[in-house]
């Protein structure tokens, strides 16, 4: 299938279907008109009676939900075509803010007392203790420069690579993603800082903090951030 060009649409056939590169400088109405003209002229079929997947590339154009639906409906009006994906190189401010928050390291200096809950979207660096009955939650990793004697939940948004580290690891409950470990019996008071993580089988493991550099070599964002 050869590449064909219209004023606002470039179509390329691939082994995965059709890829539509849409002009990102024209108005949305002009884009719809150009796409409508292209669809009315060209006929697309795989010769087997199956629908052809369409992958849309928007470039530096952002589509609102209503616009995306109009685009999808227009392509779906051709009975042999179905939209598989819509990709854009730009995102909404809200999405950008959410991504920023998830990648942030939030530093807090306090004692989390019984009944209190400390919640952050990204990584948490707590300078202080978590008393029994206190809870800390983070979408990313948890680092406690103090005693962890309450509840710690890291990776609550589905991050199974999150870790929990503490100067004194004596929790009543540890949770990473959805994996729960209640007051691990083998944790004993000592001088070594410890960390908890999920192994390749999804089991929670407690190790000396020195092992963290080998277990999660990508954890370098704290450098220069403390």
Curated annotation (Swiss-Prot):
Pfam family, one: MinC_C
Transport listed as a keyword: no
InterPro entries in UniProt: CAP/MinC_C, MinC, MinC_C_sf, MinC_N_1, Septum_form_inhib_MinC_C
Keywords: Cell cycle, Cell division, Septation
The UniProt record lists the keyword Transmembrane helix: no
GO biological process, one term: regulation of cell septum assembly
Subunit annotation: Interacts with MinD and FtsZ.
Function: Cell division inhibitor that blocks the formation of polar Z ring septums. Rapidly oscillates between the poles of the cell to destabilize FtsZ filaments that have formed before they mature into polar Z rings. Prevents FtsZ polymerization.
PANTHER family named in the record: SEPTUM SITE-DETERMINING PROTEIN MINC
Record family assignment: Belongs to the MinC family.
Protein's name in the database: Probable septum site-determining protein MinC
């Amino acid at each position: 299938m050869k590449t064909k060009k219209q004023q606002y649409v470039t179509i390329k056939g691939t082994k995965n279907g059709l890829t539509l590169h849409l002009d990102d400088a024209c108005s949305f109405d002009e884009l719809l008109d150009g796409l409508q003209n292209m669809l009315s002229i060209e006929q697309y079929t795989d010769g087997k009676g199956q629908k052809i997947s369409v992958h849309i590339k928007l470039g530096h154009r952002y589509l609102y939900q209503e616009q995306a639906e109009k685009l999808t409906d227009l392509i779906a009006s051709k009975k042999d075509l179905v939209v598989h994906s819509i990709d854009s190189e730009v995102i909404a401010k809200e999405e950008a803010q959410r991504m920023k928050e998830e990648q942030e390291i939030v530093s807090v200096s306090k004692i989390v007392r019984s009944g209190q809950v400390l919640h952050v979207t990204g990584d948490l660096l707590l300078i202080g203790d978590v008393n029994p009955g206190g809870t800390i939650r983070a979408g990313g990793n948890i680092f406690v420069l103090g005693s962890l004697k309450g509840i710690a939940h890291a990776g609550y948004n589905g991050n199974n690579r999150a870790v929990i580290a503490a100067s004194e690891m004596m929790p009543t409950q540890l949770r990473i993603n959805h994996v729960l470990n209640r007051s691990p019996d083998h944790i004993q008071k000592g001088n070594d800082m410890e960390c908890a993580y999920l192994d390749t089988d999804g089991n929670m493991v407690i190790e000396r903090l020195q092992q963290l550099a080998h277990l999660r070599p990508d954890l370098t964002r704290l450098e220069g951030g403390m």
